[in-house]
């Protein structure tokens, strides 16, 4: 999994931390890296996630934009439109924390760290911090594909057009 060069660089980084912090807590990690005990690499690198490809990041931005710029403003302007307001997909539910973790983490980064998508952010509590607890990827893909192909990603959609996308 790690080349000898990568192991050497990481081991040296931990040796520097050991000196700076004047602690022996890094000795085990240094030994794992120097000896090449691959079975324990996940303990060292477990908090480093796989990359989210640009296309997947754009997909997440698209679905959040749909809710933030299309659905939420419509709901604010039309508070008596109960069909849309009560529609099961009238708000962004998030992604499944078990099977769609990288998407959920990216949403949290965008909303919590970058402070983007303010209309969507208000649903954090309602959605268990954007953990839908069930797969949403296919549903969102259908919605984004319809929004792109049929409506050219317009922001000023009519009621029927919004419902069409929510029902995708």
Swiss-Prot record:
Keywords: Plasmid. Gene3D superfamilies: Helix hairpin bin (1.10.287.680), yfbu gene product, domain 2 (1.10.3190.10). InterPro entries: UPF0304_YfbU, YfbU_alpha-helical_sf, YfbU_helix-hairpin_sf. Belongs to the UPF0304 family. NCBIfam families: PRK05445.1. This is UPF0304 protein MJECS11.
């Amino acid at each position: 999994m790690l080349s000898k060069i990568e192991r050497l660089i990481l081991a040296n980084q931990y040796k520097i931390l050991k000196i700076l912090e004047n602690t022996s807590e890094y000795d085990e990690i240094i030994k794992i890296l120097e000896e090449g005990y691959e079975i324990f690499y996940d303990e060292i690198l477990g908090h480093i996630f796989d990359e989210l490809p640009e296309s997947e990041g754009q997909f997440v931005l698209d679905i959040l934009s749909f809710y933030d710029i299309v659905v939420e403003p419509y709901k604010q302007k039309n508070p008596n439109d109960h069909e849309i307001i009560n529609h099961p997909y009238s708000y962004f539910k998030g992604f499944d924390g078990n099977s769609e973790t990288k998407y959920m983490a990216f949403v949290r980064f965008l909303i919590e760290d970058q402070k983007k998508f303010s209309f969507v952010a208000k649903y954090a509590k309602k959605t268990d911090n954007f953990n839908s607890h069930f797969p949403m990827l296919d549903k969102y893909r259908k919605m984004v594909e319809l929004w792109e192909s049929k409506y050219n990603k317009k922001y000023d959609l009519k009621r029927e057009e919004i419902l069409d996308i929510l029902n995708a």
